[in-house]
Amino acid sequence: MKRRPRQRYRAIRRVPQAYPGLYLRLKVAPIVPALAATVAVGALADISSLPEDVRARARTLSDDMGTAISEKSQRIFFDTPGLDTLLIRSLSHVARRTATVGRAWARTVVAVGADKDGRMARMLPLIPRRGYDALMTGMLTIGTAVGALRGGAVHVALLRDSAADPAFQDPLPGHPEAQIRRVDAPEQLSDMCADIDELYWSRTIGPAVKITRVGEGEARRWLLSLVGTESMTWRSTNNPADVETNIRLMLGLESAMSVGVVRVLHAAMERDGVPTERWTREPVLICGHSQGGIVAAALASVPADEAGVNVAGILSTGGPNRRIRVRPDVVTVAVTHDQDVMPSLDGSPDRAPDRRVTVGRSLVRPRTRPLYYAHSSSTYTETVRLLERKVRVTPWGRLASAMAALQDFMPAPGEPTRVMHFEIWQDILTPTAEGTWNTVAALERGGSYEPATYHIDYAATAPRLPRIARARRRASIPARLSSALSSLRKDRS
């Protein structure tokens, strides 16, 4: 049976600037009336003057309509890969215009001498000029100012050590017992992805991570399986794998998960007897899903002495990390699904900013929740298994070389290993009595971090080509009609 060809080149993601905003509006227009109706029905449920049974029916109907809209919108974005990129670009354009207005207003205040305390002059250089930076900065500053994003000090604790007796450690007061079953050292890259599948269900307060020490002496290396975002609420919790960490990583700021990953690696090395001066020289392979891929790229984008760990290899699955340029000596394989919207949340086109090897896979839409299926860690585990099978059949090219380099981190038969599990959690800061403006101004900047730029993505105009020859004047409409009719007449001679 002949296989149906699959489209691999997604122009809407590669060159999103070639698509007008009207294209996005026409695609999402079918859900707008249903969304408005859902909001109206939901408003009826909040009217206290209505009978309780009417409000209950309205509430139930609103929930059902919301579920239907969610399924329909997921199908639209799944069937048209790249709409997510256009959506982020549209939001970035709005944020850029807002930042431009704010910059002009601040300059006016400074120019007329109304800036008595000088805070406008101090804030003016901090207003981003790029749309995506303005969008992320606005979300972080507003969330911090209103007290929603209040992540504090980061803590780590050992959950299990295969070299300890007993292996499982007693949970800390107030912490539930971790549900961990995959305790063996991984043998393949897909095993690390499968470990992430289980870590999502560890039932700990913060994310659980799995660290495997492979080999001894100069051959010693470390494997780290890292989960993605676990808390999608807009208010900080004790789980640092949240929205605040995502925003801070996009802006190149220090995040709770980055700090936690470095601390758990240092704790594992300390338990294994590694001298402190070697902590930044021990090679580490990080397999990260979603947010975990961003954390891995962020740690690999700076020198090992600055990051605190030596990230030598990355396997990123579904991570929006194209804004981060990793070091040239880091072997990176980025796996993404064509229908997964999460890798496009960094606002960048589908291109590689460095020497990473990118791998894509086109999925078949399931019956329900297609976007969840496209971003699921278990779906990516299946994709990595297919990828391993592919490079075994065709062991040549950049992809096979990169996969072989990452596979070299895995333990050889009979090589000693040690498996440790850690938990990362954070404190919640108490809102201070400072004013909103002071809280926003106190946000630190990203040091020497510079996001990867795609110059064509910011091109506003294209050079106009010179006219080669004067266009020929077209005949009038009556003349063209008579000429067409004359050609249809029969020859009566």
Predicted feature residues:
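Alpha/beta hydrolase fold serine-hydrolase catalytic domain that processes acyl esters and thioesters
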Residues: 2-283, 302-493
